[in-house]
């Protein structure tokens, strides 16, 4: 769509492979490329797998049948992603089976190949980590935000990923808030400058309030 309405006279398939595809998400890069994520049932008819497609500025798909995010035997889901600066896309996602869920990260290059053979384990801890969010680029500051319930209570964690895709902070990231339980809703994050974000959420621990934090 543009300001005048539909751009193409006919819609196009997101993948060259004919399979059931559900739950699409879309992000646009700074230069107009579009990345699409969906749950694909071609190999797993129950839980599905996370797939990605890149669409160029002319509306043409670039990655054929789509890119399977993780070939691990464990279920991969809840993918969140952010366009890079070189035609690539950064992805954070959940991997595993409850109650043992890890937050993983992968980068798909502009050509449709993985930037590292083994996904980066962001949480790297036993127990339940969930609800990843991702903002920024490695050049300007890439932050992965997630919930950690490994201690029994829910902590809000943030990890910064440096150039070369190495975690910046020890202990699986900094703990932005402790013991949130189920009282946090509607998280939002905004890039302010290189290596700096504002993070907001609805906090219901005592009464409904909007909280925010600056993370550098």
Describe the function of each predicted region.
Residues 1-216:
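Extracellular, repeat-based ectodomains that mediate carbohydrate processing or recognition
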């Amino acid at each position: 769509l543009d300001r005048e309405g539909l751009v193409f006279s006919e819609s196009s398939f997101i993948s060259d492979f004919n399979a059931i595809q559900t739950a699409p998400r879309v992000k646009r890069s700074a230069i107009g490329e579009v990345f699409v994520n969906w749950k694909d049932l071609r190999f797993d008819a129950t839980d599905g797998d996370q797939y990605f497609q890149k669409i160029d500025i002319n509306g043409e798909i670039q990655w054929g049948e789509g890119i399977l995010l993780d070939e691990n035997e464990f279920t991969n889901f809840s993918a969140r992603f952010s366009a890079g600066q070189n035609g690539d896309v950064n992805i954070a996602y959940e991997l595993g089976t409850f109650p043992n869920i890890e937050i993983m990260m992968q980068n798909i290059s502009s050509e449709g190949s993985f930037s590292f053979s083994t996904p980066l384990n962001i949480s790297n801890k036993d127990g339940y980590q969930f609800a990843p969010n991702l903002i920024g680029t490695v050049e300007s500051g890439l932050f992965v935000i997630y919930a950690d319930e490994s201690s029994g209570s829910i902590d809000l964690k943030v990890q910064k990923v440096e150039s070369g895709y190495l975690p910046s902070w020890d202990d699986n990231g900094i703990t932005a808030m402790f013991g949130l339980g189920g009282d946090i809703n509607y998280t939002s994050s905004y890039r302010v400058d290189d290596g700096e974000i504002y993070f907001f959420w609805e906090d219901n621990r005592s009464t409904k309030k909007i909280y925010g934090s600056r993370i550098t």
